[in-house]
Amino acid sequence: VEQGLKKLAKRGNSPIVGVGFSQANALSAAAQAYPEAQFTLIDMVVPEANVQSVVFRAQEGSFLVGALAAMKSESDTIGFIGGMDIPLISVFGCGYEQGAKHINPSINVVHSFVGSTGAAFANPSKGSEIARSQFESGADIIFAAAGSSGNGVIQAAADMGKLAIGVDSNQNYLQPGTVLTSMVKRVGEAAYQSYAAAQNGTWKAGFVSMGLAEGGVDWALDEHNRA
């Protein structure tokens, strides 16, 4: 990835856009090697003088899906499963609970976490196990912010006739009829805005925050969950 980014910079491309934690180190190295180039990193922060770091206010999108969960729940108990109990993930759970309680102040929101290391985001079987426990305890909808561990949550919901909420990208298609909706980060919109800013001369390095007002987060409605 680093060599690819450096090649783009050497050819004069600008801005050069990367996405996520996995590209952060490579983009940082490329930005240091080509200080005259403009780089944009989406969904992660790199403190280089020529990097624009775009982060999403996930709590705002999570508030929306929490409200939807409260409207749909028949048991008045819903669940949240995060990968790790860290601030990056806690904002999803907090926004989700606030949205749910905005609709139903007495709703019960159960919070669980898959693990305490990065592996927690890549353990679908553990995600499924925790989801089954939450469902058996009375939850009828679970929102997972746990990487691929969330796939296990969605599978458990399908197996048990319950509902799940996807995260980051539109996961409605994974189990149509089981995925109530997905809290999406609109990475494409973030990239478009970065390119547009460069085109009209308003691109700036530093920190950019995108929430509902900027079109950065949303909930997914499509043919898989419209009914």
Segments from the language model and where they lie:
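A residue-level marker of the well-folded mature domains of exported/periplasmic proteins
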Residues: 1-227
